[in-house]
Amino acid sequence: MYDLFKQLIAVFILSLCFNLHARTADDATTIIRNDTLKDKAAKKAQRDAERLELRNSNDRFKISFDYLRAKLETELSFELPTGNLNSVISLENDLGLPSNSYFFTGSFLYRITPRSGLYAQYYGINRKETSQTQRDLIFKGEIIPAGTDVEAHFNTQVISTGYLYSVLKDRNAYLGFYLNIYFMFVETGIQSAYGLQDLDVELLAPLPNFGILASFKLNKWLYFNGNIGFFALKLDDFGGSIHNYDLTLMAKPVNWLGIDLSYQVFDVMVEFPSDGINTEIDYNFRGPSIGLSFFF
């Protein structure tokens, strides 16, 4: 009888301890849940406040126009699938296209949140020149003898659009990455009195790109902006690569206007078939630019 009484007391004590532990655990869970909800609510309120501040600021939209002086280098390569024909032509050295060009670029930035945004950029370069060939050239399988008067052209239209995201949460600093896609239209060709008319190569290439960008406020009115990007792709009969970077100093005398001084580099190589001939375009430009940015 005494042993039974001890067992009942032990069971009662264990039950009491279990209930006390369960109640303590429930109370702790409730406290943690309440703290989590409060933390989520505080973070949401902070995000809403940051977005409202961005909406009321002059930094949500940015439109930029730049005037660029660029040094250009352009090469065309043609190769038959059998490998019997392999020709490389420099459009500047062999066909007389100007190696320096002045052109405008335009860009637009929309900041969705203080840390993310969408942007788009456009530029176009059209070049045409009449010259006399200094050596025999092979353009798409046709031989152009030395001493032939030719008119060559190379036209480029580029649209870039993408998404950017910053890992920093600082009004005076932006450090993150971007992912974009280039839609590049290229048209090049030769006309000559030799009888070769409109030997054209046309290409519309969507090329993705990935990169890193940074922006820092140096003092009250001076900012530094920079980005660098690279991508390469190779499929069965199509391939390409893009390398670009941009360094900019921007003076901002008022909150809605920026004066930009930049140095830009853009290098693209594209391989594709054209009329049964493996064609490669290697095109790049680099040079300084000056421009204006408008914020609103």
Name each model feature, range by range.
Residues 73-101, 124-157, 184-203, 233-236, ...:
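Extracellular/periplasm-exposed beta-strand and loop segments of Gram-negative cell-envelope proteins
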Residues 115-118, 170-173, 220-224, 255-259:
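Repeated loop/turn-to-beta-strand initiation elements of outer-membrane beta-barrel proteins
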Residues 65-69, 120-124, 177-183, 214, ...:
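Transmembrane beta-barrel strands of outer-membrane/channel proteins
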Residues 251, 283-296:
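Outer-membrane beta-barrel "beta-signal"
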Residues 60, 101-105, 156-160, 205-209, ...:
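Transmembrane beta-barrel architecture of outer-membrane proteins
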Residues 67, 110-112, 165-167, 181, ...:
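Residue-level signature of outer-membrane beta-barrel architecture
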Residues 23-122, 295:
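Short glycine/proline- and aromatic-enriched beta-strand/turn motifs that initiate or cap beta-hairpins
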Residues 80, 183-254, 266-269, 296:
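Outer-membrane beta-barrel transmembrane domain signature
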